[in-house]
Amino acid sequence: MKAYFLAVVLLTLLLPTAFAQTTSPYYHKITNLQQQKGWNGYALLSPSWSICSSCSPTGSTVNWSRTPGISSPSVSGSSTRHHIGGTRPFSDILWNNHIIGNFSSQGIYDTSHTLVPNLHHFVYDVYFFAKNIGASQALEFDINQFTGGKSFIWGHECRIAGGHEWDTYDNVHKKWVSTGIPCNPVNNAWNHLIIEVARTSGNQLLFKTITLNGDTHNLSITRSPNSTSWHAVTINYQEDGNQTQAGYSIWLDRLNFTYW
């Protein structure tokens, strides 16, 4: 029995990721999310960065817009432009999409709570384009899972004006932690980002890899979750304002999200 168990473990470790994905009964890939509905924008005002309930997309303190169906620049023929501006330095705009659970944009409500608890692997795959990338303080790409009373937020932040480095989010201490990995997206060009994360069998967050324009970095960072009463899987995209809150736009395309 021990020899059989060891063989199974070794086989599992040696299987390619693609095989593990496609053989999972929970495997699902959602493509071109940038074209789809369900995105909600929220202003996060400095210095607390809590959600501003009174802020408007057309306000002066911070303003934002999201415009789908852009043919140029585009990779697929239909990108979505995200713009941020305003007057309050270091303020941010967060766009959130509920994938599974209440308010699901995909119609996957999981009211029986049988899907979300069985998901352990997630891939955020997106192309992004900027004409003045240097105006961005940072770009943030998050994968979020809420299950079993625990909150798993795999936050990834590419600091640009903020220092050209990747940070990851510490759920327990609610702070960003530098990885030492450079983040230098190319201006006036399409950048391809792939983020891979996992929830371990012991309910820890595992930050696996970041791949930007074909350059892969293995993170292998494990952290503890926080607590919550939510039940969902969501993703975020966020643009951070710089010290003058200079306006800038980022186009997203081929935003694919895979889970299993």
PLM regions: where:
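Short tryptophan-centered beta-strand motifs in secreted/extracellular beta-sheet-rich domains
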Residues: V126, A189-R199, K208-I210
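Extracellular glycan-recognition surfaces and repeat-rich motifs
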Residues: N40-F90
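Positively charged n-region of N-terminal signal peptides that target proteins for export
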Residues: M1-Y4
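Extracellular beta-strand elements of beta-rich domains used
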Residues: L193, I250-F257
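Short, aromatic/His-centered strand-loop micro-motif at the edge of beta-sheets
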Residues: T168-I194
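Flexible glycan-contacting loops in extracellular carbohydrate-active proteins
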Residues: L219-D253
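Secretory/extracellular carbohydrate-interaction modules
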Residues: S76-S78, H82-W166
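Sec/Tat signal peptide C-region and signal peptidase I cleavage site
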Residues: L15-A20
